[in-house]
Design a protein with these regions (language model features):
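Alpha-helical transmembrane segments of multi-pass small-molecule/ion transporters
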Residues: 1-310
């Protein structure tokens, strides 16, 4: 019930932020041009700042080495998810020009908006440490493989590797330098960066609300592949992944955290990446809508099953 309560609260916040975006578009305070300005601000500044400061504040060098298993499990998780989503794309006969985007919306979960409050409520002492360690690999994967997957593949142009060099990957590398070098961030600067980074989530949700307002969401509610993602990636896969980690000598807390993270709905940032790369951002937004609504039922159900399997 605790997870259900957290989920409903986060969904309520999700809806409020998006309604603000809808209202701003309806009243012509925002339009497609200004929405893209918000997207660039989040992608180029607030999100990289959030990645850097949350990682530096959440992990120290000793923790990085002592909890290295989280990093290894995260790598394994994304390898398996990449293979699974490729299989799902074949199973649901996704159009060739949409396969990569479908993989992106199915692979990357909404850790920042839903994962953090759920995991930290279950594990108040170490939850944020696990999330911070996970974020290192998660964001590195999003801003490298995720960039590749959200770049249209059917336009005849080869992928430009320079896209992998971006503010977010720079933030991750810089954070690792600070952690390994045990370099403290001065108090005032830390506070300023924390506040700048904190704008990422509400701005991303307001942006998403504006995108929803500019599209016909009914065109995407009936897409079977999104429900395939819900059933297979958000329900069956987390259970199998939880069982897969059982024989290994890792703590039950880490095992449960990683399995829960794999059950999360689509990450909101994927819409921004897709639109910035010229891909079908509305398709990504449709996935967010369907998977987020379904997660109200699937996440508590999966969590309950974890309790029986533990």
């Amino acid at each position: 019930m605790e997870i259900f309560s957290i989920l409903t609260e986060q969904i309520a916040l999700f809806v409020i932020y998006m309604l603000v975006g809808v209202l701003m578009v309806k009243t012509q305070v925002l339009n497609k041009t200004t929405l893209e300005t918000i997207s660039r601000f989040v992608i180029k500044l607030s999100m990289p700042v959030m990645i850097f400061i949350n990682t530096v504040n959440g992990v120290d060098r000793a923790t990085l080495f002592s909890s290295a298993s989280v990093l290894g499990i995260t790598v394994l998780l994304y390898v398996l998810l990449f293979l699974l989503t490729r299989l799902l794309a074949v199973l649901f006969r996704i159009r060739k020009d949409t396969v990569q985007l479908y993989q992106a919306v199915s692979m990357f979960g909404n850790v920042g908006f839903m994962g953090i409050p759920i995991v930290t409520s279950i594990f108040p002492e170490k939850g944020m440490v696990y999330i911070s360690l996970f974020t290192i690999i998660d964001q590195l994967t999003l801003w490298t493989l995720g960039i590749k997957l959200t770049t249209p593949s059917g336009n005849g142009e080869p992928f430009n590797p320079k896209k992998l060099i971006n503010p977010a990957t720079a933030a991750i590398i810089l954070a690792l330098i600070f952690i390994l070098g045990q370099i403290p961030v001065p108090g005032v600067l830390n506070q300023a960066l924390t506040k700048i980074g904190a704008t990422s989530t509400p701005l991303a949700m307001i942006y998403l609300g504006g995108v929803f307002c500019c599209m016909n969401i009914r065109d995407y509610i009936g897409k079977l592949e999104f429900y395939g993602t819900v059933l297979i990636k958000m329900v069956l896969f987390p259970i199998l992944f939880f069982c897969l980690l059982g024989p290994f000598s890792i703590s039950q807390d880490i095992r449960l955290t990683m399995a829960l993270i794999s059950a999360l709905p689509t990450m909101s940032s994927v819409v921004m990446l897709a639109k910035a790369s010229g891909a079908d951002g509305d398709y990504a937004a449709g996935s967010i809508f369907v998977t987020t609504i379904c997660s109200i039922i699937t996440l508590p159900a999966v969590s309950l099953l974890f309790g029986f399997l533990s």
